[in-house]
Amino acid sequence: MTKDIAQVMAEVGRKAKAAAAPLSIATSEQKNKALNAAADAILEARADILEANRLDLANAEKNGMAASFVDRLTLNEARIDAIAEGIRAIATLPDPVGEVIAEWDRPNGLHIERVRTPLGVIGVIYESRPNVTADAGALCLKAGNAVILRGGSDSAHSSAAIHKALVKGLEAANLPADAIQIVPVTDRAAVGEMLKGLGGAIDVIVPRGGKSLVARVQSEARVPVFAHLEGICHLYIDKSADLDMARRIALDAKMRRTGICGAAETLLVDRAVASTHLAPILGDLAAGGCEIRGSAEVLALYPAAKPATEEDWSTEYLDAIISVALVDGISGAIDHINRYSSHHTEAIVAEDAQTVARFFNEIDSAILLHNASTQFADGGEFGMGAEIGIATGKMHARGPVGVEQLTSFKYRVRGSGQVRG
Protein backbone atom coordinates (compact mmCIF):
# COMPACT_ATOMS: atom_id res chain seq x y z
CA MET A 1 0.00 0.00 0.00
CA THR A 2 2.81 2.40 0.92
CA LYS A 3 4.45 1.71 -2.43
CA ASP A 4 1.20 2.59 -4.20
CA ILE A 5 1.02 5.88 -2.26
CA ALA A 6 4.62 6.64 -3.19
CA GLN A 7 3.71 6.16 -6.85
CA VAL A 8 0.57 8.28 -6.53
CA MET A 9 2.47 11.09 -4.84
CA ALA A 10 5.33 10.93 -7.35
CA GLU A 11 2.76 11.50 -10.11
CA VAL A 12 1.29 14.45 -8.17
CA GLY A 13 4.80 15.89 -7.95
CA ARG A 14 5.47 15.44 -11.67
CA LYS A 15 2.21 17.16 -12.58
CA ALA A 16 2.93 20.07 -10.23
CA LYS A 17 6.42 20.52 -11.64
CA ALA A 18 5.05 20.51 -15.18
CA ALA A 19 2.37 23.07 -14.28
CA ALA A 20 4.84 25.36 -12.50
CA ALA A 21 6.68 26.29 -15.69
CA PRO A 22 3.77 27.90 -17.61
CA LEU A 23 2.38 29.35 -14.38
CA SER A 24 5.67 31.12 -13.68
CA ILE A 25 5.25 33.19 -16.86
CA ALA A 26 1.49 33.70 -16.62
CA THR A 27 0.44 37.34 -16.88
CA SER A 28 -1.09 39.25 -13.98
CA GLU A 29 -4.31 39.41 -15.98
CA GLN A 30 -4.43 35.63 -16.34
CA LYS A 31 -3.80 34.99 -12.66
CA ASN A 32 -6.36 37.57 -11.56
CA LYS A 33 -8.92 36.15 -13.99
CA ALA A 34 -8.35 32.69 -12.51
CA LEU A 35 -8.75 34.00 -8.96
CA ASN A 36 -11.95 35.92 -9.67
CA ALA A 37 -13.38 32.96 -11.60
CA ALA A 38 -12.51 30.69 -8.67
CA ALA A 39 -14.34 33.03 -6.29
CA ASP A 40 -17.38 32.93 -8.59
CA ALA A 41 -17.19 29.13 -8.74
CA ILE A 42 -17.10 28.86 -4.94
CA LEU A 43 -20.27 30.93 -4.63
CA GLU A 44 -21.95 28.92 -7.40
CA ALA A 45 -20.99 25.66 -5.67
CA ARG A 46 -22.21 26.88 -2.27
CA ALA A 47 -24.78 24.07 -1.91
CA ASP A 48 -22.26 21.38 -2.87
CA ILE A 49 -19.63 22.78 -0.49
CA LEU A 50 -22.11 22.91 2.41
CA GLU A 51 -23.24 19.34 1.69
CA ALA A 52 -19.62 18.16 1.64
CA ASN A 53 -19.03 20.00 4.91
CA ARG A 54 -22.04 18.26 6.48
CA LEU A 55 -20.38 14.92 5.74
CA ASP A 56 -17.19 16.07 7.47
CA LEU A 57 -19.14 17.42 10.45
CA ALA A 58 -21.06 14.13 10.78
CA ASN A 59 -17.76 12.24 10.89
CA ALA A 60 -16.38 14.69 13.46
CA GLU A 61 -19.43 14.20 15.67
CA LYS A 62 -19.16 10.41 15.31
CA ASN A 63 -15.50 10.59 16.31
CA GLY A 64 -16.25 12.76 19.35
CA MET A 65 -14.11 15.72 18.28
CA ALA A 66 -13.83 18.75 20.58
CA ALA A 67 -16.10 21.77 20.09
CA SER A 68 -13.15 23.99 19.10
CA PHE A 69 -12.16 21.47 16.41
CA VAL A 70 -15.72 21.33 15.08
CA ASP A 71 -15.84 25.14 14.95
CA ARG A 72 -12.68 25.27 12.81
CA LEU A 73 -14.15 22.62 10.53
CA THR A 74 -17.59 24.22 10.15
CA LEU A 75 -18.59 26.11 7.02
CA ASN A 76 -21.75 28.19 6.70
CA GLU A 77 -23.12 30.81 4.31
CA ALA A 78 -21.10 33.62 5.89
CA ARG A 79 -17.86 31.64 5.91
CA ILE A 80 -18.25 30.68 2.26
CA ASP A 81 -18.86 34.34 1.41
CA ALA A 82 -15.69 35.21 3.35
CA ILE A 83 -13.68 32.58 1.44
CA ALA A 84 -14.79 34.05 -1.90
CA GLU A 85 -14.10 37.60 -0.70
CA GLY A 86 -10.65 36.53 0.46
CA ILE A 87 -9.80 35.14 -2.97
CA ARG A 88 -10.98 38.37 -4.64
CA ALA A 89 -8.84 40.37 -2.20
CA ILE A 90 -5.78 38.36 -3.23
CA ALA A 91 -6.59 39.15 -6.87
CA THR A 92 -6.37 42.88 -6.08
CA LEU A 93 -2.86 42.61 -4.58
CA PRO A 94 0.11 43.77 -6.67
CA ASP A 95 1.71 40.94 -8.64
CA PRO A 96 5.15 40.35 -7.09
CA VAL A 97 6.48 38.33 -10.03
CA GLY A 98 8.79 40.35 -12.26
CA GLU A 99 9.15 43.21 -9.78
CA VAL A 100 12.61 44.78 -9.89
CA ILE A 101 13.69 44.78 -6.23
CA ALA A 102 16.98 46.60 -6.83
CA GLU A 103 19.10 47.73 -9.77
CA TRP A 104 22.49 49.33 -10.20
CA ASP A 105 25.22 50.05 -12.75
CA ARG A 106 28.80 48.86 -12.57
CA PRO A 107 31.82 50.94 -13.65
CA ASN A 108 32.32 48.56 -16.59
CA GLY A 109 28.87 49.41 -17.95
CA LEU A 110 27.00 46.30 -16.78
CA HIS A 111 23.46 47.00 -15.60
CA ILE A 112 22.30 44.58 -12.88
CA GLU A 113 18.72 43.97 -11.73
CA ARG A 114 17.43 41.78 -8.92
CA VAL A 115 13.99 40.51 -9.98
CA ARG A 116 11.28 38.57 -8.11
CA THR A 117 10.49 35.08 -9.40
CA PRO A 118 8.15 32.30 -8.21
CA LEU A 119 9.54 29.68 -5.85
CA GLY A 120 8.19 26.84 -8.01
CA VAL A 121 6.13 24.16 -6.25
CA ILE A 122 4.88 24.65 -2.69
CA GLY A 123 3.56 21.86 -0.51
CA VAL A 124 1.00 22.93 2.09
CA ILE A 125 0.13 20.49 4.89
CA TYR A 126 -2.75 21.52 7.14
CA GLU A 127 -5.36 20.13 9.48
CA SER A 128 -9.07 20.74 9.87
CA ARG A 129 -9.62 24.21 8.40
CA PRO A 130 -11.14 23.84 4.91
CA ASN A 131 -10.68 27.58 4.24
CA VAL A 132 -6.91 26.98 4.11
CA THR A 133 -7.54 25.10 0.84
CA ALA A 134 -8.75 28.35 -0.72
CA ASP A 135 -6.30 30.70 1.01
CA ALA A 136 -3.21 28.64 0.20
CA GLY A 137 -4.29 27.84 -3.33
CA ALA A 138 -5.03 31.49 -4.11
CA LEU A 139 -1.85 32.89 -2.54
CA CYS A 140 0.38 30.39 -4.33
CA LEU A 141 -1.37 31.08 -7.64
CA LYS A 142 -0.96 34.85 -7.25
CA ALA A 143 2.79 34.38 -6.67
CA GLY A 144 3.07 32.15 -9.75
CA ASN A 145 3.63 28.92 -7.82
CA ALA A 146 2.09 25.51 -8.30
CA VAL A 147 0.80 24.06 -5.03
CA ILE A 148 0.13 20.62 -3.61
CA LEU A 149 -2.48 20.76 -0.84
CA ARG A 150 -2.71 18.07 1.81
CA GLY A 151 -5.50 18.82 4.25
CA GLY A 152 -6.53 16.69 7.21
CA SER A 153 -8.73 13.69 6.53
CA ASP A 154 -11.35 15.28 8.81
CA SER A 155 -11.96 18.02 6.23
CA ALA A 156 -11.46 15.88 3.11
CA HIS A 157 -14.94 16.34 1.64
CA SER A 158 -15.03 20.11 2.25
CA SER A 159 -11.52 20.65 0.87
CA ALA A 160 -12.28 18.58 -2.24
CA ALA A 161 -15.38 20.67 -2.98
CA ILE A 162 -13.43 23.93 -2.60
CA HIS A 163 -10.57 22.56 -4.70
CA LYS A 164 -13.00 21.76 -7.51
CA ALA A 165 -13.94 25.46 -7.65
CA LEU A 166 -10.28 26.53 -7.70
CA VAL A 167 -9.65 24.26 -10.70
CA LYS A 168 -12.60 25.85 -12.51
CA GLY A 169 -10.90 29.20 -12.00
CA LEU A 170 -7.65 27.93 -13.51
CA GLU A 171 -9.47 26.51 -16.51
CA ALA A 172 -11.36 29.78 -17.07
CA ALA A 173 -8.01 31.57 -17.45
CA ASN A 174 -6.41 28.84 -19.60
CA LEU A 175 -3.93 27.99 -16.87
CA PRO A 176 -2.93 24.37 -16.14
CA ALA A 177 -5.44 22.60 -13.89
CA ASP A 178 -2.55 20.81 -12.16
CA ALA A 179 -1.27 24.15 -10.82
CA ILE A 180 -3.46 23.56 -7.75
CA GLN A 181 -3.65 19.90 -6.74
CA ILE A 182 -5.12 18.27 -3.69
CA VAL A 183 -3.55 15.03 -2.45
CA PRO A 184 -5.94 12.30 -3.63
CA VAL A 185 -5.38 9.94 -0.67
CA THR A 186 -6.02 10.38 3.05
CA ASP A 187 -3.32 7.94 4.19
CA ARG A 188 -0.74 9.73 6.37
CA ALA A 189 2.02 8.09 4.36
CA ALA A 190 1.32 10.78 1.75
CA VAL A 191 2.64 13.40 4.19
CA GLY A 192 5.87 11.46 4.53
CA GLU A 193 6.28 11.42 0.77
CA MET A 194 5.76 15.19 0.60
CA LEU A 195 8.35 15.76 3.32
CA LYS A 196 10.87 13.85 1.21
CA GLY A 197 10.26 16.40 -1.56
CA LEU A 198 8.64 14.11 -4.17
CA GLY A 199 11.87 13.54 -6.02
CA GLY A 200 12.84 17.19 -6.16
CA ALA A 201 9.40 18.41 -7.23
CA ILE A 202 8.62 20.38 -4.04
CA ASP A 203 10.64 23.54 -3.38
CA VAL A 204 9.24 24.46 0.03
CA ILE A 205 6.81 23.05 2.61
CA VAL A 206 4.37 25.14 4.66
CA PRO A 207 2.66 23.39 7.60
CA ARG A 208 -0.54 24.92 9.02
CA GLY A 209 -1.67 23.24 12.20
CA GLY A 210 -0.87 22.24 15.73
CA LYS A 211 2.49 21.84 17.41
CA SER A 212 2.77 18.09 16.72
CA LEU A 213 2.24 18.57 12.97
CA VAL A 214 4.72 21.43 12.73
CA ALA A 215 7.29 19.56 14.83
CA ARG A 216 7.03 16.53 12.57
CA VAL A 217 7.43 18.63 9.44
CA GLN A 218 10.44 20.51 10.82
CA SER A 219 12.03 17.25 11.96
CA GLU A 220 11.48 15.14 8.84
CA ALA A 221 11.39 17.56 5.91
CA ARG A 222 14.19 17.32 3.38
CA VAL A 223 13.17 20.61 1.76
CA PRO A 224 12.99 24.14 3.25
CA VAL A 225 10.10 24.82 5.65
CA PHE A 226 8.25 28.09 6.35
CA ALA A 227 6.72 27.67 9.81
CA HIS A 228 6.60 28.51 13.48
CA LEU A 229 6.49 25.80 16.11
CA GLU A 230 4.58 27.85 18.67
CA GLY A 231 3.73 31.43 19.58
CA ILE A 232 5.03 32.19 23.06
CA CYS A 233 4.36 35.92 22.76
CA HIS A 234 5.29 38.47 25.43
CA LEU A 235 3.86 41.84 26.41
CA TYR A 236 6.13 44.13 28.46
CA ILE A 237 4.74 47.11 30.39
CA ASP A 238 7.54 49.62 31.01
CA LYS A 239 7.66 52.20 33.81
CA SER A 240 7.18 54.90 31.15
CA ALA A 241 3.94 53.33 29.86
CA ASP A 242 0.60 55.10 29.89
CA LEU A 243 -1.48 52.97 32.26
CA ASP A 244 -4.78 53.33 30.39
CA MET A 245 -3.07 52.31 27.15
CA ALA A 246 -1.36 49.39 28.88
CA ARG A 247 -4.70 48.14 30.21
CA ARG A 248 -6.37 48.28 26.79
CA ILE A 249 -3.46 46.58 25.04
CA ALA A 250 -3.02 43.84 27.66
CA LEU A 251 -6.70 42.91 27.55
CA ASP A 252 -6.76 42.78 23.76
CA ALA A 253 -3.41 40.98 23.40
CA LYS A 254 -4.57 38.14 25.64
CA MET A 255 -8.34 37.97 25.33
CA ARG A 256 -9.43 39.14 21.86
CA ARG A 257 -8.78 35.64 20.52
CA THR A 258 -6.96 33.35 22.92
CA GLY A 259 -6.43 30.49 20.46
CA ILE A 260 -4.32 32.25 17.83
CA CYS A 261 -0.54 32.22 17.61
CA GLY A 262 -0.34 36.00 18.17
CA ALA A 263 -2.10 35.92 21.55
CA ALA A 264 0.07 37.11 24.45
CA GLU A 265 1.03 34.24 26.76
CA THR A 266 3.32 36.09 29.21
CA LEU A 267 2.92 39.56 30.73
CA LEU A 268 6.03 41.28 32.08
CA VAL A 269 5.66 44.39 34.24
CA ASP A 270 8.44 46.78 35.22
CA ARG A 271 9.07 46.32 38.94
CA ALA A 272 9.23 50.12 39.31
CA VAL A 273 5.49 50.49 38.61
CA ALA A 274 4.22 47.16 39.91
CA SER A 275 2.47 48.77 42.89
CA THR A 276 0.39 51.04 40.64
CA HIS A 277 0.07 49.16 37.33
CA LEU A 278 -0.15 45.46 38.16
CA ALA A 279 -3.51 45.25 39.95
CA PRO A 280 -5.53 47.29 37.40
CA ILE A 281 -4.14 45.31 34.45
CA LEU A 282 -4.65 41.92 36.09
CA GLY A 283 -8.07 42.97 37.35
CA ASP A 284 -9.16 43.69 33.78
CA LEU A 285 -7.87 40.31 32.61
CA ALA A 286 -9.53 38.44 35.47
CA ALA A 287 -12.82 40.24 34.84
CA GLY A 288 -12.57 39.10 31.23
CA GLY A 289 -12.31 35.48 32.35
CA CYS A 290 -8.54 35.04 32.24
CA GLU A 291 -6.67 32.82 34.71
CA ILE A 292 -3.62 34.60 36.15
CA ARG A 293 -0.48 32.60 36.97
CA GLY A 294 2.10 34.74 38.72
CA SER A 295 5.56 34.67 40.21
CA ALA A 296 5.92 34.93 44.01
CA GLU A 297 6.25 38.72 43.73
CA VAL A 298 3.08 38.92 41.65
CA LEU A 299 1.16 36.80 44.17
CA ALA A 300 2.22 39.16 46.96
CA LEU A 301 0.70 42.12 45.11
CA TYR A 302 -2.22 40.23 43.54
CA PRO A 303 -3.23 37.32 45.82
CA ALA A 304 -6.00 36.13 43.46
CA ALA A 305 -3.35 34.80 41.06
CA LYS A 306 -2.26 31.16 41.02
CA PRO A 307 1.43 30.29 41.46
CA ALA A 308 3.36 30.05 38.19
CA THR A 309 5.78 27.18 37.64
CA GLU A 310 8.98 27.21 35.58
CA GLU A 311 7.06 25.42 32.84
CA ASP A 312 4.58 28.30 32.54
CA TRP A 313 7.21 30.67 31.13
CA SER A 314 7.67 28.43 28.08
CA THR A 315 4.05 27.38 27.57
CA GLU A 316 1.79 28.39 24.69
CA TYR A 317 -1.61 28.20 26.37
CA LEU A 318 -3.88 29.04 23.42
CA ASP A 319 -6.45 29.60 26.16
CA ALA A 320 -7.61 32.23 28.66
CA ILE A 321 -4.49 31.83 30.82
CA ILE A 322 -1.53 34.20 31.18
CA SER A 323 1.73 33.95 33.13
CA VAL A 324 2.89 37.16 34.83
CA ALA A 325 6.28 38.24 36.18
CA LEU A 326 7.95 41.42 37.42
CA VAL A 327 11.25 42.43 35.80
CA ASP A 328 13.96 45.03 36.38
CA GLY A 329 13.06 47.43 33.60
CA ILE A 330 13.88 46.94 29.95
CA SER A 331 17.06 44.95 30.70
CA GLY A 332 15.08 42.41 32.72
CA ALA A 333 12.39 42.22 30.05
CA ILE A 334 14.95 41.60 27.30
CA ASP A 335 16.64 38.87 29.35
CA HIS A 336 13.35 37.10 30.08
CA ILE A 337 12.07 37.32 26.50
CA ASN A 338 15.31 36.15 24.91
CA ARG A 339 15.37 33.20 27.32
CA TYR A 340 11.79 31.97 26.91
CA SER A 341 10.49 33.37 23.62
CA SER A 342 9.65 31.26 20.57
CA HIS A 343 10.74 34.29 18.48
CA HIS A 344 7.25 34.87 17.10
CA THR A 345 5.87 38.21 18.41
CA GLU A 346 6.68 40.52 21.33
CA ALA A 347 5.20 43.90 22.29
CA ILE A 348 6.21 46.80 24.54
CA VAL A 349 4.05 49.55 26.02
CA ALA A 350 6.33 52.52 26.73
CA GLU A 351 6.74 56.24 26.09
CA ASP A 352 10.52 56.43 26.54
CA ALA A 353 12.20 56.41 23.12
CA GLN A 354 15.50 54.91 24.31
CA THR A 355 13.67 52.05 26.00
CA VAL A 356 11.72 51.31 22.83
CA ALA A 357 14.92 51.43 20.77
CA ARG A 358 16.55 48.83 23.03
CA PHE A 359 13.47 46.61 22.77
CA PHE A 360 13.57 46.75 18.96
CA ASN A 361 17.34 46.29 18.73
CA GLU A 362 18.00 43.63 21.35
CA ILE A 363 15.10 41.21 20.94
CA ASP A 364 15.40 38.71 18.12
CA SER A 365 11.80 37.86 17.22
CA ALA A 366 10.06 37.95 13.86
CA ILE A 367 7.56 40.66 14.87
CA LEU A 368 8.09 43.45 17.42
CA LEU A 369 5.37 45.96 18.31
CA HIS A 370 5.41 49.26 20.20
CA ASN A 371 2.21 50.49 21.86
CA ALA A 372 0.09 47.96 19.96
CA SER A 373 -1.44 44.56 20.66
CA THR A 374 0.38 41.34 19.76
CA GLN A 375 -2.80 40.32 17.94
CA PHE A 376 -1.71 42.51 15.02
CA ALA A 377 0.74 39.71 14.12
CA ASP A 378 -1.20 38.87 11.00
CA GLY A 379 -0.58 39.24 7.28
CA GLY A 380 -3.96 40.87 6.72
CA GLU A 381 -3.22 43.48 9.39
CA PHE A 382 0.15 44.11 7.72
CA GLY A 383 -1.62 44.91 4.45
CA MET A 384 -0.38 41.73 2.78
CA GLY A 385 -3.87 40.40 2.08
CA ALA A 386 -4.14 36.85 3.33
CA GLU A 387 -1.16 34.93 4.69
CA ILE A 388 -0.18 31.32 4.28
CA GLY A 389 1.32 31.32 7.78
CA ILE A 390 3.88 33.01 10.02
CA ALA A 391 7.52 31.97 9.90
CA THR A 392 10.01 32.35 12.73
CA GLY A 393 13.08 31.02 10.90
CA LYS A 394 15.77 33.37 9.64
CA MET A 395 16.21 32.02 6.13
CA HIS A 396 14.10 33.59 3.36
CA ALA A 397 10.64 34.27 4.85
CA ARG A 398 10.19 35.67 8.38
CA GLY A 399 6.99 36.94 9.94
CA PRO A 400 3.72 36.81 7.96
CA VAL A 401 4.15 34.82 4.73
CA GLY A 402 2.14 36.53 1.99
CA VAL A 403 2.48 36.63 -1.79
CA GLU A 404 5.77 38.54 -1.71
CA GLN A 405 7.35 36.00 0.64
CA LEU A 406 6.26 33.19 -1.71
CA THR A 407 8.78 34.39 -4.28
CA SER A 408 12.54 34.16 -4.73
CA PHE A 409 14.66 36.30 -7.05
CA LYS A 410 17.14 36.12 -9.87
CA TYR A 411 19.65 38.56 -11.35
CA ARG A 412 19.33 40.02 -14.83
CA VAL A 413 22.61 41.44 -16.09
CA ARG A 414 22.65 43.53 -19.27
CA GLY A 415 25.87 44.28 -21.09
CA SER A 416 27.09 45.71 -24.37
CA GLY A 417 29.81 43.25 -25.26
CA GLN A 418 31.85 43.29 -22.04
CA VAL A 419 34.37 40.49 -21.44
CA ARG A 420 36.26 39.94 -18.23
CA GLY A 421 39.62 39.39 -19.96
Curated annotation (Swiss-Prot):
Q: Which GO terms describe its molecular function?
A: glutamate-5-semialdehyde dehydrogenase activity; NADP binding
Instruction: Indicate where this protein resides in the cell.
Output: Cytoplasm
An annotated GO cellular component: cytoplasm
| EC numbers, comma separated | 1.2.1.41
**Which key words tag this protein in UniProt?**
Amino-acid biosynthesis, Cytoplasm, NADP, Oxidoreductase, Proline biosynthesis
Give the enzyme's main class according to its UniProt record, as a single word: oxidoreductase
Q: Does the keyword Ribonucleoprotein apply?
A: no
Q: Which family does it belong to?
A: Belongs to the gamma-glutamyl phosphate reductase family.
Quote the protein name from its UniProt record: Gamma-glutamyl phosphate reductase
